[in-house]
Amino acid sequence: MSKIIGIDLGTTNSAVAVLEGGEAKIIPNPEGARTTPSVVGFKNGERQVGEVAKRAAITNPNTISSIKRHMGTNYKETIEGKDYSPQEISAIILQYLKSYAEDYLGETVDKAVITVPAYFNDAQRQATKDAGKIAGLEVERIINEPTAAALAYGMDKTETDQTILVFDLGGGTFDVSILELGDGVFEVHSTAGDNELGGDDFDKKIIDYLVAEFKKDNGIDLSQDKMALQRLKDAAEKAKKDLSGVTSTQISLPFITAGEAGPLHLEVTLTRAKFDELTHDLVERTIAPTRQALKDANLSASDIDQVILVGGSTRIPAVQETIKKELGKEPHKGVNPDEVVAMGAAIQGGVITGDVKDVVLLDVTPLSLGIETMGGVMTTLIERNTTIPTSKSQTFSTAADNQPAVDIHVLQGERPMAKDNKTLGRFQLADIPAAPRGIPQIEVSFDIDKNGIVTVRAKDLGTGKEQNIVIKSSSGLTDEEIEKMVQDAEANAEEDKKNKENAELRNNADQLVFTVDKTLKELEGKVEEEEVKKAEAARDELQEALKGEDFEAIKEKTESLNEIVQNLSVKLYEQAAAEQQAAGGAEGQEAPQNDDVVDAEFEEVNDDDKENK
């Protein structure tokens, strides 16, 4: 069975890992980094992904970041006149991760385990699966990020029973999960979180502070200047990271904008104390989900054996201090918070292929599922934190006499009223025989698979008539749309490959021109003038071709020039060999005389030595 890669598709950074020799290993990207910024840029019809796109963001307005925050919604990014869904942008990132994983492994990769925040709803999970499909990946499993982290942490600790709390504060989402580890079983007891809380929000607090300070000093609102805002964003992210290690950092942005008197510079010293003050409310927002997870698992803080930190934002000292205070124990620092999720996903891939044995993963659904019933109430069929896969059915009836159809409104959430919860989908069971209200028996069944994706079925028990719906992402992508996106992604991948090949061809041609110039100087006067002129003419033709975009012509002229230069070099070596041979023959004729002289001198030296003794 081919390898299944593990992908942590993050809000700000993504990572890919693979199981090798029973161990999960992070695959470095082409720049050598172990994580890749989840940033996509479009420039002159070309796509840039990762660090390259992030660096160019200051000058390139067609740059998209933190797209994960829009997964499962109807959000669209319009770039160069084309609309892109969050799935398509995510697919571009996944394609990039897939391509360098293939380069590393030396084989085609078409299967993956992709992680999502534990608190992602059904629409967001479905959107993630669609993104994988568009990128040319068969998503073998959608796994919760905290669960993946627990897998990576607990793989070598399966002999000991322990209860762990995974505190996952990433770039855009926050999750807390409580799991029990023992005898190779990883059982999730509860999960809670906030899909609108992450490192991006901490950055925004710094940006808002810098904008306010600059406006106070200079009367100019930098938030209206896109380029200045991107520079502020980069500076804020750097300052946040710096303040995890030092108590004060200098934010210096020269020529940030221009005023009436000329260019203006931003110079601000940000202390850790000020940063903690600015972000205090964000840190406080992590407490309620932590308490909720403990409550749902029927545990107290003292029952937790180990606290695992996941996500780059857990490096913030105030966050660590809050966890320590809330749970009464020092968090475990033996795992890399940026890498542990991808590694756990790779381990789950190994479980699927059979490379990892005796490991059972029991995950839960993060939110309750139900339908809308009379009075706009949500009737729950599956409670949150139910172990998945699972199924549940309940019988309902009609609300009016001779009601011909029943509308099924599928909901996900914890609020008592239907309107306050997330709509997953709607469908209708029609052709119900005329009968007084309360007589027809309509059975509604919910099924949740191992990926947390929901199927709902409604059946008229009287007639046996049935209707079902697989809940699709609320972005409303049809199978045809996904298929078209798959084809577009493949075409783009082919185009990207061709662009890369053309760039290499151009570079090789440039290098050849340089080499030819150097070689012709060395050959001056050593080969026939006619041969030199032939090489110069071919070189000039290649230089002319390099001015255009006809890559077939460049390839042809490169091959032609290469052949001429090789022939020149061969002639040069042949000439040199002939000269050496001629010189060697002349030496051979004089050799006997020289031998006599050397022998005579040698004899004399020995005689002298004998006399001296």
Swiss-Prot record:
Biased composition (Low complexity): 577-591
Alphabetized CDD domains for the sequence: ASKHA_NBD_HSP70_DnaK-like
Keywords annotated in UniProt: ATP-binding, Chaperone, Nucleotide-binding, Phosphoprotein, Stress response
Modified residues (Phosphothreonine): T173
Region (Disordered): 577-613
HAMAP family noted in UniProt: DnaK
PANTHER family: HEAT SHOCK PROTEIN 70KDA (PTHR19375)
NCBIfam families: PRK00290.1, prok_dnaK
Role according to the record: Acts as a chaperone.
Name of the protein this chain belongs to: Chaperone protein DnaK
Organism: Listeria monocytogenes serotype 4a (strain HCC23)
